Amino acid sequence: MFDAFTKVVSQADTRGEMLSTAQIDALSQMVAESNKRLDAVNRITSNASTIVSNAARSLFAEQPQLIAPGGNAYTSRRMAACLRDMEIILRYVTYAVFAGDASVLEDRCLNGLRETYLALGTPGSSVAVGVGKMKEAALAIVNDPAGITPGDCSALASEIASYFDRACAAVS
């Protein structure tokens, strides 16, 4: 797992180069925006159970076959596993937001997830829909100006969206 700073230094070191002005400027911008990043992580984390439960509720309303007898989320044990997986994905998205880098999400959560779902017979497309619903909720929270450090959050929102998009792509 790398944070944005470690990743930039590691890449420059591998090439045997000094940090470029563009790299330093990008990291400086990240530092300047750090309070927004912390606010976003805090708000998503504080609302995690609501984000997950509302996303699951919406998913099951759209795809009732998942909770019907024989469905992948039928029985309380399978439903709990589904909610747990959604919560884990959301948790690793917040880690990536905090670090400013997707490697923790990729390495510790998404790597091999599609294969696991295929082996279990879990429809990856349904998981992707659920992740998309969590993305919508998380972005609504991040884009709500109340309680967020003042300023433009569009770049951070775009970054957060990209982490959810990676998760969707990894499972579908």
UniProtKB/Swiss-Prot annotation:
Binding site for (2R,3E)-phycocyanobilin 2: 153
Keyword Electron transport on entry: yes
GO biological process, one term: photosynthesis
PTM entry text: Contains two covalently linked bilin chromophores.
Superkingdom assignment: Bacteria
Cellular location(s): Cellular thylakoid membrane
Binding positions for (2R,3E)-phycocyanobilin 1 per the UniProt entry: 82
InterPro entries per the UniProt record, alphabetical: Globin-like_sf, Phycobilisome_asu/bsu, Phycobilisome_asu/bsu_sf, Phycocyanin_b
Quaternary structure, from the entry: The alpha and beta subunits exhibit high affinity for one another and form heterodimers. These heterodimers form heterohexamers of 3 alpha and 3 beta subunits which, in turn, aggregate into a heterododecamer consisting of 2 heterohexamers.
Similarity comment: family membership: Belongs to the phycobiliprotein family.
Protein name, per record: C-phycocyanin beta subunit
Natural source organism: Arthrospira platensis
